[in-house]
Each structure stands twice: as structure tokens, then as C-alpha cells.
Swiss-Prot record:
PROSITE patterns: SMALL_CYTOKINES_CC. SUPFAM superfamilies: Interleukin 8-like chemokines. This is C-C motif chemokine 20. GO terms for cellular component: extracellular space. Thymic medulla (at protein level). Prominently expressed in the small intestine, colon and appendix. Also found in thymus, spleen, lymph node and lung. The long form might be dominant in intestinal, and the short form in lymphoid tissues. Expressed by IL17 producing helper T-cells (Th17). Pfam families: IL8. One of its GO terms (molecular function) is cytokine activity. GO terms for biological process: calcium-mediated signaling; cell chemotaxis; chemotaxis; immune response; inflammatory response; positive regulation of T cell migration; T cell migration; thymocyte migration.
Length: 97
């Protein structure tokens, strides 16, 4: 009977581990990622915030996701100069608050 109990415990633990891994995979696949970048710069007055997307997390590319006054999310290349300037400007605004 002890052998049967150990087997049942092993199967229960394996099931819990499998359920956890499946939920992690589902969470990563539901993540909304940038797949490309906007080609034209956004006016800085239209941008109200930003989020950083990192390629080493759930997405394939690094990106800055700008949030606009019209509640749009726009993906931009973090290597572009206009993107760097906009991020710096927004960071300064936050520091002044």
C-alpha cells in the first residue's frame, strides 16, 4: 500500500507541475507584443506615457510603447533618436512631479 501511496503522490505532484507550466505558457502567449515599429515620429505633445518592451521577456523585439492622449499604443524603435528624446522628456516630466 505504501508503494501505491507514493505513486499517487507522484502523479498528483506531476499533475500540479504540468498545470502550472501550462498556465505560464498561456500567460506568455496572451501578452500583447510589438511586432514592428512606427516609421514616422510622434509629436511629443501627443505622448502621455510609455512602457518598455524587452526582447528577453515574452516578446521578440525591444520596443518603447508610447501611450497617446487618444488612448492609442504606438510601438517605436528604442534606438531611434526621436524615441530617446521623447523618453527623456517624459522621464523629466515625471521627476518634476
Amino acid at each position: 500500500m505504501a508503494c501505491g501511496g507514493k505513486r499517487l503522490l507522484f502523479l498528483a505532484l506531476a499533475w500540479v507541475l504540468l498545470a502550472h507550466l501550462c498556465s505560464q505558457a498561456e500567460a506568455a502567449s496572451n501578452y500583447d507584443c510589438c511586432l514592428s515599429y512606427i516609421q514616422t515620429p510622434l509629436p511629443s505633445r501627443a505622448i502621455v506615457g510609455f512602457t518598455r518592451q524587452m526582447a528577453d521577456e515574452a516578446c521578440d523585439i525591444n520596443a518603447i510603447i508610447f501611450h497617446t492622449k487618444k488612448r492609442k499604443s504606438v510601438c517605436a524603435d528604442p534606438k531611434q533618436n526621436w524615441v530617446k528624446r521623447a523618453v527623456n522628456l517624459l522621464s523629466l516630466r515625471v521627476k518634476k512631479m
